[in-house]
């Protein structure tokens, strides 16, 4: 039987590298093959041309149509929040394959413009499904983020007890970190704004491979919600940290309970004082969360879910 074809449409070199992580889940043993199309640019020539041509949307739509014609996908998976131009919607509507749009940010009414061509909207925050209903989108699914096991895995390094946070600066994150009565090590662009005693601050972004290396050297990984993007969902850190054998120390959000046994597998807190006491008193077996994400929360798992939901008839042929 010929393998199914999945075309992933996304953005190259995004901060989260969501697009690249899904492409990296291509596996010779899987029932499908994956190819990618980046809406921003797929090579240096495209990148240059998009800086000088008068209508980038029309140019991108023509490139996408060429890719669809040559690859002939069974499933198109759009990752990240995109509001499609009329040119792109027209091209996507020509192809009868199944289409899913996986979204991890707050959205507005513009998303509804593509509802006639999308078979399934997937949201990383469970509350987004209600937001979608308000703009007429009912074909939706809660599909949390995941992690890339080729990058995030446990090593043999000894783990420091110091609390580590790696992530972008935001006002609500700074407000919370200022109140945490513990020294931290922090990496991320914008954190030069923070002045915190006994803390080590590296105010710049680092590549995912370095993030994973740091996780392997720390026991406790702090997770703070960026409220500019989500309401109660989980970010990639919720899966990447346990995958490295760390204990996830997360600000409480409701979606944590959809994945973890929060009293046994992670440390959660509702305020900074509770965080300090739980770090002292709570006994967590890091292997419980590590095994859970390993078996159930990779990008390969997410693709399997979508293939089973949208291409079940083709699998059984």
Positions of the model-derived regions?
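Active-site proximal beta-strand in glycosyltransferases
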Residues: 91-106
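Active-site donor-binding loop signature of nucleotide-sugar glycosyltransferases
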Residues: 104, 145, 168, 270-271
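Conserved acidic donor-binding segment of nucleotide-sugar-dependent glycosyltransferases
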Residues: 262-272, 278-283
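A charged, aromatic-enriched C-terminal amphipathic alpha-helix characteristic of glycosyltransferases
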Residues: 280-310
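Generic C-terminal helix-cap and adjacent flexible tail
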Residues: 311-317
């Amino acid at each position: 039987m010929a393998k199914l074809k999945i075309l992933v449409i996304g953005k190259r070199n995004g901060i989260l590298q969501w697009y690249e992580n899904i492409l990296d889940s291509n596996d010779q043993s899987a029932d499908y093959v994956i190819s990618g199309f980046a809406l921003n640019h797929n090579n240096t020539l495209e990148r240059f041309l998009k800086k000088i041509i008068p209508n980038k949307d029309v140019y991108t739509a023509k490139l996408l149509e060429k890719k669809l014609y040559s690859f002939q996908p069974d499933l198109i998976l759009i990752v990240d929040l995109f509001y499609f131009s009329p040119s792109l919607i027209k091209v996507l509507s020509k192809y009868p394959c199944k289409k899913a749009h996986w979204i991890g940010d707050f959205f507005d009414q513009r998303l509804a413009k593509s509802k006639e061509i999308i078979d399934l909207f997937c949201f990383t925050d469970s509350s987004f499904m209600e937001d979608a209903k308000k703009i007429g989108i009912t074909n939706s699914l809660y599909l949390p983020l995941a992690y890339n096991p080729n990058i995030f895995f446990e090593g043999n390094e000894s783990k420091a007890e110091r609390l580590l946070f790696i992530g972008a600066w935001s006002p609500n994150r700074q407000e919370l970190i200022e109140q945490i009565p513990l020294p931290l090590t922090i990496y991320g662009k914008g954190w030069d704004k923070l002045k915190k005693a006994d803390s080590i601050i590296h105010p710049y972004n680092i590549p995912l491979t370095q993030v994973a290396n740091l996780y392997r050297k720390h026991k406790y990984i702090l997770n703070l919600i960026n409220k500019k993007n989500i309401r109660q969902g989980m970010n990639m850190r919720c899966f990447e940290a346990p995958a490295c054998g760390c204990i996830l120390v997360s600000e409480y959000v409701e979606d944590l309970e959809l994945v973890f046994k929060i009293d046994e597998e992670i440390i959660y807190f509702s305020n900074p004082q509770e965080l300090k006491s739980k770090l002292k008193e709570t006994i967590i077996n890091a292997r419980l969360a590590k095994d859970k994400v390993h078996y159930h929360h990779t990008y390969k798992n997410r693709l399997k879910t979508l293939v089973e939901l949208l291409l079940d008839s083709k699998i059984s042929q």
